[in-house]
Amino acid sequence: MNHLVIISVFLSSVLLLYRGESGITSSFIRSEWPAVDIPLDHHVFKVPKGYNAPQQVHITQGDYDGKAVIISWVTPDEPGSSQVHYGAVQGKYEFVAQGTYHNYTFYKYKSGFIHHCLVSDLEHDTKYYYKIESGESSREFWFVTPPHVHPDASYKFGIIGDMGQTFNSLSTLEHYMESGAQAVLFLGDLSYADRYQYNDVGVRWDSWGRFVERSTAYQPWLWSAGNHEVDYMPYMGEVTPFRNYLQRYTTPYLASKSSSPLWYAVRRASAHIIVLSSYSPFVKYTPQWHWLSEELTRVDREKTPWLIVLMHVPIYNSNEAHFMEGESMRAAFEEWFVQHKVDVIFAGHVHAYERSYRISNVRYNVSSGDRYPVPDKSAPVYITVGDGGNQEGLAGRFTEPQPDYSAFREASYGHSTLDIKNRTHAIYHWNRNDDGKKVATDEFVLHNQYWGKNIRRRKLKKHYIRSVVGGWIAT
C-alpha cells in the first residue's frame, strides 16, 4: 500500500511538471534575523590558532571527471608552504602535491598569501585525508571523491545562492550541512564584500572564507560568479572586474577547453554541469557563446544523463526584483537549452525562491496575440535559489497574478538539494530556514529528459527498470 502511495505521488509530480497547473505563491512569513552582517569578532570568523596558520580552506573539482581537486587556502603573515600532504588513511600522508601562491592588493588592502594546489590522479569514490602546513602550524581535513562517471551513479548536490555573511546566512549554512549533500552548486554572490568600502572590502572577503570553511574544506563547492563578484570600484582606482573573486576562487576551466574561469563545465557522477557567466559577454560570436556551443556537443547523455546549467541571473522570474534582467541570455541560449533537453537550470540573484514548470519562449503562443512562455516538454525546469541570507534582505514582492509558468514561489531564506537516484529520476527539495528547523517546503520528482523518453526507456531491460524504481521506492 505504501508503495502505491509513493508511486501515486511520483506520477502526480511528473504530471505537474508538464501541465500548466495553477502555481502556488506561499503566504508564509518568517521572523528572520536582521539583514546585517555578523560582527567580525563573532566566533564564526575565528582565526585558526598558531602563527601563520592556514585559513579560508576550500576545495573545488580540479578536472573534467572528478579525479582531481583544487585545494586553496590563505596564510596571513608569510608564504609558508604550498604543499598538500594526503592519503587514504587518516594520519598517514603518503603523497605530496606542490601548489603555488600569490598575493594581491585592492585599494590599500593587501591580501595574505593565497595558495592553490592541484591534487590529481585520485581514485573515485574514496575518502582522502589531507594536511596543510605552515611552519609549526598545520591543519588536517578530508574529502570524498565522487563515483566513476556512470549513468546510474547516485549523487546528492546542494544548491545555494546569494549567501553573504549574516545570521540568516549562518542558518542556511547550518541547515545545508545537515542535508547529507556531497557537493555544492553555488549560484554566485559569495561574500557581499563589495557593499563595503576601501580596505574593508578585502577584510570581508577574508571573513567569508573563514565563515564557510566548515563546509568548503571538506567537500567541493562548484563556483559561479554573480554581480557582487564584479567589484568594479573606480572611485577607489579598482577597475578590473572580478579581481577579488578570481584571485581567491579558482575553477577547472581549462579541462573543459574554456578560455575563462568564469564559464566552464565538469562531469560528476551521472551529471554534466555547465557554469555560465551572466556578467561576461555571451551574445553571438563571443568566446562564451562559442564555448557553450561546443560544450553542448560534448555532452554524452549515455554516460552523464543529467544535464544541469548554473547561472546567476534567472531567465524566468516573476519577482518584481530584477524582473526581465535575464532576457538577453534567454534570447541567446534558450533555443539551445531546449534543443539539448537540459534537465534543470539553477540561478540566484533574486533574493527569494521560485520554481517554474517546463516552459519555453522558443515558439511563441501567437494564437492569443501575446508573446508568452508556453508549456514545452523538451524545456528545462527553471529554479531560482537566491535566498542564501545576504544583508540586502528578501525580495518579497512578486508580480500578480502569478504567471502560468510559475509553479511555486516564496520569499524566505533557504537552500535546495538535488538527489540523483539513477539515470531516470532525481528527488528535489527546497528547504526553508524555518526558525532554526530544517523544513522541506517545495519538493518533487524530476524525471530525466533523455532517459525519460519512451523510446529510450524501451532500451532498458525490464528487470533494470524494476530494480531502479524499486530501489528508489525503498529509499
UniProtKB/Swiss-Prot annotation:
Disulfide-bonded cysteines: none
Recorded catalytic activity of this chain's protein: a phosphate monoester + H2O = an alcohol + phosphate; 2 a phenolic donor + H2O2 = 2 a phenolic radical donor + 2 H2O
Active site (record annotation): 322 (proton donor)
GO BP annotations, alphabetical order: hydrogen peroxide catabolic process; phosphate ion homeostasis; regulation of phosphorus metabolic process
UniProt KW NADP keyword: no
Any Pfam family matching the protein: Metallophos
Compartments reported by the entry: Vacuole
Modification note: Glycosylated.
EC id: 3.1.3.2, 1.11.1.7
pH dependence: Optimum pH is 5.6 for the phosphatase activity and 8.8 for the peroxidase activity.
Domain of life, per lineage: Eukaryota
Cofactor note: Binds 1 Fe cation per subunit.
Keyword annotations from UniProtKB, A to Z: Glycoprotein, Hydrogen peroxide, Hydrolase, Iron, Metal-binding, Oxidoreductase, Peroxidase, Signal, Vacuole, Zinc
Protein name per its UniProtKB record: Bifunctional purple acid phosphatase 26
Name of encoding gene: PAP26
